[in-house]
Amino acid sequence: MIGKLSGKVDSQGDDYVIIDVNGVGYLVYASGKTLGTLAEGEFYKLFIETHVREEHIHLYGFLTLEEKIFFNLLQSVNGIGTRMALFILSSLTPSDIQIAVNNEDKNIFKAISGVGAKLAERIVLELKGKVAKISSGSAIIKESLNIKNITPVASNEVIKALVNLGFSRFEAQNAVQGIITQNPEISIDELIKTALKNRNSNFS
C-alpha cells in the first residue's frame, strides 16, 4: 500500500496528475483545488489513499492530511463515492465542510453541481457527529495542530498512515500512544516522524 509520494509533476489531466518518482510515473487522482495548486516540473509531497479493487488500483492524492481525512469522511456518507468526494473537495475546503456541518448549512452542499437536497441533508446528518466542533470561521486541522485537539478520525488516520509505512496496526497503536504520553503537545507531522525514527532505531 502506498501512503505517500514525493516527486515532480510530469503532467496533468482533468482529474489526475502524473507524479514522477525516480523515473516511475504514478497516476494520482486529486481534487480540482489540489490540481490547481500543482505546477508542472515542480516537486511535491502528496498524502496517498490507495484503493485496491480486483480490476484496478487507484491512487488518490492530497497536499494536506486534513484533505485526505475529509475525503474518507465524505465517503462514509451514503451515496458518496470517490468521484463525488473529490468533486466536493474541489468546491469546498475541509474547513468549509466542517463549518457547514456544524452549522447544519445544507445550502453550502446544495450549491455544488450534482449534490441534491437529499444528499446535502445526509452529509449534514451523517457527518454531524464525526467532525470536531469549532468556532465559526476558525480553521480546523492546522499544519501545527496539537494532538490534544485531534478528532478520533484524525488519530485513526495517523495510525493508518503508519500502517501504510510498514507498521503492523498493533505497532502503530502502541507507537502513537507511547509518543503522545511523553509529549501531549506533539504535532501530527512530528508524531509520524518520531514513530518512524523510533522504529528505525529499534531495528538498527
Swiss-Prot record:
Region (Domain III): 150-204
Region named Flexible linker: 143-149
A Pfam family matched in the record: RuvA_N
Matching InterPro entries: DNA_helicase_Holl-junc_RuvA_I (IPR013849), NA-bd_OB-fold (IPR012340), RuvA (IPR000085), RuvA_2-like (IPR010994), RuvA_C (IPR011114), RuvA_C_sf (IPR036267)
Keyword field: Cytoplasm, DNA damage, DNA recombination, DNA repair, DNA-binding
One GO cellular component term: Holliday junction resolvase complex
GO biological process: DNA recombination; DNA repair
Domain notes: Has three domains with a flexible linker between the domains II and III and assumes an 'L' shape. Domain III is highly mobile and contacts RuvB.
Subunit structure: Homotetramer. Forms an RuvA(8)-RuvB(12)-Holliday junction (HJ) complex. HJ DNA is sandwiched between 2 RuvA tetramers; dsDNA enters through RuvA and exits via RuvB. An RuvB hexamer assembles on each DNA strand where it exits the tetramer. Each RuvB hexamer is contacted by two RuvA subunits (via domain III) on 2 adjacent RuvB subunits; this complex drives branch migration. In the full resolvosome a probable DNA-RuvA(4)-RuvB(12)-RuvC(2) complex forms which resolves the HJ.
The protein's name: Holliday junction branch migration complex subunit RuvA
Organism the protein comes from: Rickettsia rickettsii (strain Sheila Smith)
